[in-house]
Amino acid sequence: MIEKIKNTRSHRKFTDKKISKEEILKILEGARYSASAKNSQFLRYSYTVDDEKCKKLFSTIALGGLLKLEDKPTLEERPRAYILISAKKDTNIPDFLQYFDIGIASQNIALLANELGYGACIVMSYNKNVFKEVLEVPDDYETRAVIVLGEAKDIVKLTDSKDENDTKYFIENGTH
């Protein structure tokens, strides 16, 4: 299991390989079975693998906010699928418990994507209104997180940090 965790890193650049609806549903099955605080199971999931929708959503997310412009993904390197995690607005679940559940579900999504040969990145910086519109999220739900997916183009190399205060990205020749 530790090797699966080590191999499940954040990917921000993707090939043009499409992800099927069946693969997304398999990934979402893992999210559905995620542990939930108080067994509340309040999270809801929306997704798209439609290329036109993926193009539109790509322009509304921030992948690697600290990256130099030349290191950011291009339209050709965009994600090929998006999963949006939402929660009902009137839930009595405190925010800190909601984000606890979102983290568990997001990690399960990333692990399952990796198992199917795809990379993923959990994104919190995105245009919530555009995602609600494109993915047709009901008004009584609030968006909470996005997971972008695709066949990873970038290569991840795990290294130990020499300075605990250094959180900068390391990128060299497509490896980070």
Model-derived regions: residue spans:
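Acidic, surface-exposed loops and disordered segments
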Residues: 1-176
